[in-house]
């Protein structure tokens, strides 16, 4: 009798995705982040579901409902902090996953890569709306500032902003719809993840060498299931260390003050994982220009397959490109730091320089370096 996992219509899909999947034998720990992102999504959906049972999306009671969750609900504080810091873990894994894709040339799988970029946008939108829900000072002003950016769109901008707000300012209608979207989007993300995996399993996994690995593949289970479980344990450990020892480390103290439209916080800034994009936005004095730079700073990822000039896939054997990649990584750290600083000298000029460097490396220097490497190898 044939094994049920190979014949049953439903179990067969799971088998081909997680058990008998042919996997390159040399993939490193950088390939762990896909499964860790799946784990993060599950954690966020489960904790979010329990938070939604006690949360009220009304401007009068939203802040106190979060307080109620932390004080009166059994382990409510734990669920709330796992959800808040789980988002940070999600973005750490996300950025490392994207970085791995850039370094090893995984973007040559067009469909998988483009779905991935769409996923990144969707997750960013979800995280932004989630940050608004506790209705603290930074929630309110963050929502006001970021939604206001849409008013830079010519002709329809103002109408669009008022339509999103559901009125003439960020108020009850805005909070209610943000809660509705924040609830539904993770399920849309889960569906997109399925599509991401579908395209990914069409081509199979890339590997650190960038070479075709058909002759050297092993079954996913038990080799990589064990490896993924180790990654999951390390992720859970680091998340729980963060949650139980310093849950507010990555948050903003201003968000413990209830939202007040009459009192603007001295420094309005988003969560740490958006600071690099926020720094790029602020580095351009023109409003529309800033918004375009902000969108393009993420959308630029879709251009990588077009900008790939090298005859080798990854950067494993390309020292010049490796060097530029790490300069780009350092530049993103600089932008993240600048995004959290006040708009004054010398931070303005540092932010502008880092923003120009970011786009220049990706659009000009990396493709030129790739062509030079081809030349040096007489290809």
UniProtKB/Swiss-Prot annotation:
Q: How does it sit in the membrane?
A: Multi-pass membrane protein
Record localization: Mitochondrion inner membrane
Q: How is the cofactor bound?
A: Binds 2 heme b groups non-covalently.
Gene Ontology terms, MF aspect: metal ion binding; ubiquinol-cytochrome-c reductase activity
Q: Which InterPro entries match?
A: Cyt_b/b6_C (IPR005798), Cyt_b/b6_C_sf (IPR036150), Cyt_b/b6_N (IPR005797), Cytb/b6-like_sf (IPR027387), Cytochrome_b (IPR030689), Cytochrome_b_C_euk/bac (IPR048260), Cytochrome_b_N_euk/bac (IPR048259), Di-haem_cyt_TM (IPR016174)
Q: Name one GO biological process term.
A: mitochondrial electron transport, ubiquinol to cytochrome c
Task: Give the UniProt keywords, A-Z.
Answer: Electron transport, Heme, Iron, Membrane, Metal-binding, Mitochondrion, Mitochondrion inner membrane, Respiratory chain, Transmembrane, Transmembrane helix, Transport, Ubiquinone
Q: Where are the transmembrane segments?
A: 33-53, 77-98, 113-133, 178-198, 226-246, 288-308, 320-340, 347-367
Matching PANTHER family: CYTOCHROME B (PTHR19271:SF16)
Protein name, UniProt field:
Cytochrome b
The species is Petaurista hainana (Hainan giant flying squirrel)
Q: What gene is this protein translated from?
A: MT-CYB
């Amino acid at each position: 009798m044939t094994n049920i996992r190979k014949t049953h219509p439903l179990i067969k899909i799971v088998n081909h995705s997680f058990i008998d999947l042919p996997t390159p034998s040399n993939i490193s720990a950088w390939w762990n982040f896909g499964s860790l992102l799946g784990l993060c999504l599950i954690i966020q959906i489960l904790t979010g579901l329990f938070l939604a049972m006690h949360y009220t999306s009304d401007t009068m009671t939203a802040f106190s409902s979060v307080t109620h969750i932390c004080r009166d609900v059994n382990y409510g504080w734990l669920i709330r902090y796992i959800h808040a810091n789980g988002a940070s873990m999600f973005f750490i894994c996300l950025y490392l996953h994207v970085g791995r894709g850039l370094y090893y040339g995984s973007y040559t799988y067009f469909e998988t890569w483009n779905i991935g970029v769409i996923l990144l946008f969707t997750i960013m939108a979800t995280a932004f709306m989630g940050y608004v829900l506790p209705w603290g000072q930074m929630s309110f002003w963050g929502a006001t500032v970021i939604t206001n950016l849409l008013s830079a769109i010519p002709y329809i901008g103002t109408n669009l902003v008022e339509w999103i707000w559901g009125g003439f300012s960020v108020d009850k209608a805005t909070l209610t719809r943000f809660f509705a979207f924040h609830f539904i989007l993770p399920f849309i993300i889960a569906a997109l993840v399925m599509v991401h995996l579908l395209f990914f399993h069409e081509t199979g996994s890339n590997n650190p060498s960038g070479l075709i690995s058909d002759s050297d593949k092993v079954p996913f289970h038990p080799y990589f299931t064990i490896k993924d479980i180790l990654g999951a344990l390390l992720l859970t450990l680091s998340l729980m260390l963060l949650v139980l020892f310093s849950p507010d480390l990555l948050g903003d103290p201003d968000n413990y003050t209830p939202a007040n439209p009459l009192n603007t916080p001295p420094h309005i800034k988003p969560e740490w994982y958006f600071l690099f994009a926020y720094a790029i936005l602020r580095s351009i004095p023109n409003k529309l220009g800033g918004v375009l730079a902000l969108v393009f700073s993420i959308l630029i990822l879709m251009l990588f397959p077009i900008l790939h000039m090298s005859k080798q896939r990854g950067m494993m054997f390309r020292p010049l490109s490796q060097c530029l990649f790490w300069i780009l990584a350092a530049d993103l750290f600089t932008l993240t730091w600048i995004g959290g600083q006040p708009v004054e000298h010398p931070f303005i000029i540092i932010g502008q320089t880092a923003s120009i460097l970011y786009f220049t490396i990706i659009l000009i220097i990396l493709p030129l370096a790739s062509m030079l490497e081809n030349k040096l190898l007489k290809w």
